[in-house]
From Swiss-Prot:
Protein's name according to its UniProt entry: Protein cornichon homolog 1
Keywords: Endoplasmic reticulum, ER-Golgi transport, Golgi apparatus, Membrane, Transmembrane, Transmembrane helix, Transport
Transmembrane annotation, as ranges: 11-31, 57-77, 123-143
Gene: CNIH1
Example GO BP: vesicle-mediated transport
GO cellular component, one term: Golgi membrane
InterPro entries: Cornichon (IPR003377), Cornichon_conserved (IPR033466)
Native species: Pongo abelii
Length: 144
């Protein structure tokens, strides 16, 4: 059982994916609160917007790590979400800060539903990725 760079990448990905799972859960709860009018859109967008860039950077860091470790299957599984993150960030509303959510448009029913679906899809992806990274870490540690 040897400790390789690929094993380190999977271990770090496990820890950071747990963080991304909490981000996705926070995202889902925040949009549910908006849907049920528990919180106003300005406050909610002010708490959600600072989480966007760290989430995207953590995921991009995964992709760079797995590229350097030559874990091609793992990189291939992460590329669609990375491409979506890049597209989503490039097509964000024009604002003064680096966020995605505009308080003036977030309460539109279609945008709110889209953001909720996005949160659930990301939660599913991060949960599946967490268990895949766990499997990959064990496989790399045992096989080398």
């Amino acid at each position: 059982m040897a400790f390789t760079f690929a094993a380190f990448c999977y271990m770090l990905a496990l820890l950071l994916t747990a963080t991304l799972i909490f981000f996705a859960i926070w995202h889902i709860i925040a949009f549910d609160e908006l849907k049920t009018d528990y919180k106003n859109p300005i406050d909610q967008c002010n708490t959600l917007n600072p989480l966007v860039l760290p989430e995207y950077l953590i995921h991009a860091f995964f992709c760079v790590m797995f590229l350097c470790a030559a874990e091609w299957l793992t990189l291939g599984l992460n590329m669609p979400l990375l491409a979506y993150h890049i597209w989503r960030y490039m097509s964000r509303p024009v604002m003064s800060g680096p966020g995605l959510y505009d308080p003036t448009t977030i309460m539109n029913a279609d945008i709110l539903a889209y953001c909720q679906k996005e949160g659930w899809c990301k939660l599913a992806f991060y949960l599946l990725a967490f268990f895949y990274y766990l499997y990959g870490m064990i496989y790399v540690l045992v096989s080398s």
